[in-house]
C-alpha cells in the first residue's frame, strides 16, 4: 500500500466501510470490511493480525508514567498505523476490492490513558499515516468529543448494539474485552450502558505471569483451581469503583497486575495458589457483571456476549451461573462475537461522515449526543 493506491472511487453496489479495533488486551488488531446500507451489516472480509511483540511491549509500557513518553508514544502510534494498514490490505485482498471502493476506515487506536475525570482520553493512533498508507479516508479519535461534552467517552458501542440486537423483550449485550461493558436494551427506553469492571485484562496478566501464556485458552488454567469466596469478596470490597453508579468507565489505568498484586498482598487469608487466583478472577468478572445488571433493574431475558471472552467456555459458564439466565454468544444472533467491536467502529465512521450524533447521554453522561470522530482524508 502506497500513494499509488490513491484515486477516484470505483462503483461498488452499497456503501463499504472498514472497522479496525485493538482492545485493552493488546493482543492484536481486528478488522472487518462491511457493507452498511442494508438492514443488517454484511461482512465481506475479516482479519485478525497479532500484535508484534515489540509494539505490544511499548504499548504496555505507555500505560504507566515514565521517561521519554512523547517520542515513544509517537513511534508506537506509527507502528500501530502500519499494523492497521496491513489489516486493510488483507481485507481488500480477501474481497477483491481496491481502496477507492471503500468510503472510510473507522480506526479506534489503542487506549493508553482514559481519564474522563480529568477531561481527557488518549488512544494512540496515527490516522494521517494510515490514510496515506491505505489510500482511504480515515475517521479516528471517536472518544474525545464525548469527553469534551462532559461524558465518559465510553462505552461507545451501545447504540450499535441497539441497532443490531434490540427487539421486543429486554436484553443485555455484554462485551468481554480487556474490560467488560454491558448494554441494556429495554423496549420503550433508550439504551443504557456502562463498564462493569475487569474481564480479560486481569485474567491475561495473571495467566502470563504464572504460565507464560498470553491468555488462558478455553479457561483451562482457571479450571485447575477453585473459587476462593473470601478472596472474591476482598477483591470487590477493596475497590470503590465497583460501587459507583453509572455512567462510569474504566480501563487498564485502574485494573492491572499492580492492582491485583496489591490486593493479594493485603488479603488476610492463606496465600492462594495461582490457579485458585485465576478461578477467582474468572468469577470476579462474572460476579461484577451480574451485580451491575441486578443494580440496573433492567431484568434482561437473556444476555448476548461478544469480544474475546465469548470464546472462553469457563468464563461463559461462570456468567451463566452468576446471571441465572440464558447466556450465549452473539453468533447465535447472526453476528460473529469476534468482530462486533470492529463492526461498531465501521458503523461509527459512517455516522461521522453523515454527521449523525452517535454518542448516547444515557450511556456516557454527556450533556448531549455529539458527532464522534475526526476525519483524515486520504
Curated annotation (Swiss-Prot):
<dbReference type="GO" id="GO:0006040">
    <property type="term" value="P:amino sugar metabolic process"/>
</dbReference>
<dbReference type="GO" id="GO:0005524">
    <property type="term" value="F:ATP binding"/>
</dbReference>
<dbReference type="InterPro" id="IPR043129">
    <property type="entry name" value="ATPase_NBD"/>
</dbReference>
<comment type="pathway">
    <text>Cell wall biogenesis; peptidoglycan recycling.</text>
</comment>
<keyword id="KW-0808">Transferase</keyword>
<keyword id="KW-0418">Kinase</keyword>
<protein>
    <recommendedName>
        <fullName>Anhydro-N-acetylmuramic acid kinase</fullName>
        <ecNumber>2.7.1.170</ecNumber>
    </recommendedName>
</protein>
<dbReference type="GO" id="GO:0016773">
    <property type="term" value="F:phosphotransferase activity, alcohol group as acceptor"/>
</dbReference>
<comment type="function">
    <text>Catalyzes the specific phosphorylation of 1,6-anhydro-N-acetylmuramic acid (anhMurNAc) with the simultaneous cleavage of the 1,6-anhydro ring, generating MurNAc-6-P. Is required for the utilization of anhMurNAc either imported from the medium or derived from its own cell wall murein, and thus plays a role in cell wall recycling.</text>
</comment>
<dbReference type="GO" id="GO:0009254">
    <property type="term" value="P:peptidoglycan turnover"/>
</dbReference>
<dbReference type="GO" id="GO:0016301">
    <property type="term" value="F:kinase activity"/>
</dbReference>
<keyword id="KW-0547">Nucleotide-binding</keyword>
<keyword id="KW-0119">Carbohydrate metabolism</keyword>
<keyword id="KW-0067">ATP-binding</keyword>
<dbReference type="Pfam" id="PF03702">
    <property type="entry name" value="AnmK"/>
</dbReference>
<comment type="similarity">
    <text>Belongs to the anhydro-N-acetylmuramic acid kinase family.</text>
</comment>
<feature type="binding site">
    <location>
        <begin position="23"/>
        <end position="30"/>
    </location>
    <ligand>
        <name>ATP</name>
    </ligand>
</feature>
<comment type="pathway">
    <text>Amino-sugar metabolism; 1,6-anhydro-N-acetylmuramate degradation.</text>
</comment>
<dbReference type="InterPro" id="IPR005338">
    <property type="entry name" value="Anhydro_N_Ac-Mur_kinase"/>
</dbReference>
<dbReference type="GO" id="GO:0097175">
    <property type="term" value="P:1,6-anhydro-N-acetyl-beta-muramic acid catabolic process"/>
</dbReference>
Amino acid at each position: 500500500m502506497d500513494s499509488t493506491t490513491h484515486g477516484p472511487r470505483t462503483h461498488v453496489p452499497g456503501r463499504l466501510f472498514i472497522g479496525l479495533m485493538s482492545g485493552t488486551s493488546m493482543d492484536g488488531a481486528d478488522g472487518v470490511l462491511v457493507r452498511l446500507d442494508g438492514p443488517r451489516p454484511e461482512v465481506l472480509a475479516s482479519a485478525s493480525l497479532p500484535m508484534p511483540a515489540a509494539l505490544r511491549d511499548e504499548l504496555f509500557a505507555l500505560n504507566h508514567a515514565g521517561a521519554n513518553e512523547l517520542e515513544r508514544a509517537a513511534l508506537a502510534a506509527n507502528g500501530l498505523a502500519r499494523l492497521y494498514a496491513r489489516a486493510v490490505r488483507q481485507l481488500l485482498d480477501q474481497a477483491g476490492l481496491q481502496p477507492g471502493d471503500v468510503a472510510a476506515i473507522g480506526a479506534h487506536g489503542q487506549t493508553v490513558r482514559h481519564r474522563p475525570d480529568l477531561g481527557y482520553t488518549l488512544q494512540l493512533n496515527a490516522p494521517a499515516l494510515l490514510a496515506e498508507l491505505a489510500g482511504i479516508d480515515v475517521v479516528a479519535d471517536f472518544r474525545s468529543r464525548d469527553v469534551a461534552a462532559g461524558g465518559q467517552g465510553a462505552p461507545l458501542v451501545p447504540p450499535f448494539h441497539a441497532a443490531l440486537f434490540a427487539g421486543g423483550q429486554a436484553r443485555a449485550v455484554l462485551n468481554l474485552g480487556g474490560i467488560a461493558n454491558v448494554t441494556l436494551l429495554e423496549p420503550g427506553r433508550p439504551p443504557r450502558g456502562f463498564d462493569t469492571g475487569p474481564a480479560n485484562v486481569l485474567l491475561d496478566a495473571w495467566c502470563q505471569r504464572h504460565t507464560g501464556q498470553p491468555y488462558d485458552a478455553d479457561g483451562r488454567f482457571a479450571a485447575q483451581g477453585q473459587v476462593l469466596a473470601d478472596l472474591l469478596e476482598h477483591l470487590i470490597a477493596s475497590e470503590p469503583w465497583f460501587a459507583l453508579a453509572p455512567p462510569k468507565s474504566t480501563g487498564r489505568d485502574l485494573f492491572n497486575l499492580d492492582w491485583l498484586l496489591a490486593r493479594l498482598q493485603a488479603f488476610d487469608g492463606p496465600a492462594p495458589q495461582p490457579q485458585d487466583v485465576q478461578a477467582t478472577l474468572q468469577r470476579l468478572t462474572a460476579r461484577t457483571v451480574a451485580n451491575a445488571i441486578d443494580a440496573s433493574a433492567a431484568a434482561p431475558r437473556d444476555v448476548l456476549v461478544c469480544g474475546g471472552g465469548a470464546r472462553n467456555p469457563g468464563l461463559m459458564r461462570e456468567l451463566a451461573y452468576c446471571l441465572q439466565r440464558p447466556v450465549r454468544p452473539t453468533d447465535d444472533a447472526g453476528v460473529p462475537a469476534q468482530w462486533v467491536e470492529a463492526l461498531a467502529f465501521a458503523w461509527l465512521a459512517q455516522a461521522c461522515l453523515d454527521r449523525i450524533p452517535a454518542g448516547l447521554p444515557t450511556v456516557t453522561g454527556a450533556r448531549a449526543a455529539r458527532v464522534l470522530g475526526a476525519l483524515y482524508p486520504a
